[in-house]
């Protein structure tokens, strides 16, 4: 049961400090989870402050609904739609900070019934919102071998992607897989060289989860929307847990922290340069967890926090 989980929020203070909270500000926690970041943000807001939280996991929504605070509201949906949520509330350009804690949460991993983990046998599901879309089992049973291989290679950086994809398709022809343990066993058997520090199914489970939940597309859309909804001086505080996520965040902040790229020697008037606009973000750097936090919470090891500020451009 979800109430039994003790969830340790990674980079809790650092991520919230990165928002540079104003007591009367309006903030978004795009990944409510079990509410660690939201509760800390609320503790720093005054009576006029406001926090809008988002999550697509029904279990997270159930936890959020226990917060009885007039400054707080929760939306059940993907954070990629934050632009729509903000527009509906007439808050475009008025958001003082957005926090995103990307990837799968510890409660999701630890609950066998959610199907995210190869360490616990459960239904082969992996959906952040189990009420929407295809489960991992449904997708693996209907996808072409080449498509599965592409997903494993692209989202899991799995070097044995083709071999594993073939084994998955062959197994599903014999008897459709419906359990996480079955997929983990098929992947392990199809992996010719084992990494002694990592379970052979690690990359496959990551890849399938990312694909089923459109995770990278969700991140890209949310980042794009953030430029429209943030007020000048508003902050982005984003925690990523693997290189694919961090690459997207790093590239977005870098590209939007530069001014317009005009080829050298190209004649342009001041009016034309104004239309191109200036830089929209100021990157404020990155933070990683210290040794003490990693010792207390090993899952924090790969996390990276990146912070940026919306400019007046």
From Swiss-Prot:
Keywords: Cytoplasm, Methyltransferase, rRNA processing, S-adenosyl-L-methionine, Transferase. InterPro entries: RsmH, SAM-dep_MeTrfase_MraW_recog, SAM-dependent_MTases_sf. One of its GO terms (biological process) is rRNA base methylation. Its main location: cytoplasm. Pfam families: Methyltransf_5. Gene3D superfamilies: Putative methyltransferase TM0872, insert domain, Vaccinia Virus protein VP39. It is an enzyme of class 2 (transferase). GO terms for molecular function: rRNA (cytosine-N4-)-methyltransferase activity. Its EC number is 2.1.1.199. Signal peptide: none annotated. It comes from the Bacteria. One of its GO terms (cellular component) is cytoplasm. It is found in: Cytoplasm. It catalyses: cytidine(1402) in 16S rRNA + S-adenosyl-L-methionine = N(4)-methylcytidine(1402) in 16S rRNA + S-adenosyl-L-homocysteine + H(+). Coiled coil: none annotated. S-adenosyl-L-methionine binds at residues 35-37, 55, 79, 101, 108. Belongs to the methyltransferase superfamily. RsmH family. Specifically methylates the N4 position of cytidine in position 1402 (C1402) of 16S rRNA. PANTHER family: 12S RRNA N4-METHYLCYTIDINE METHYLTRANSFERASE, S-ADENOSYL-METHYLTRANSFERASE MRAW. This is Ribosomal RNA small subunit methyltransferase H. It comes from Escherichia coli O81 (strain ED1a). The gene is rsmH.
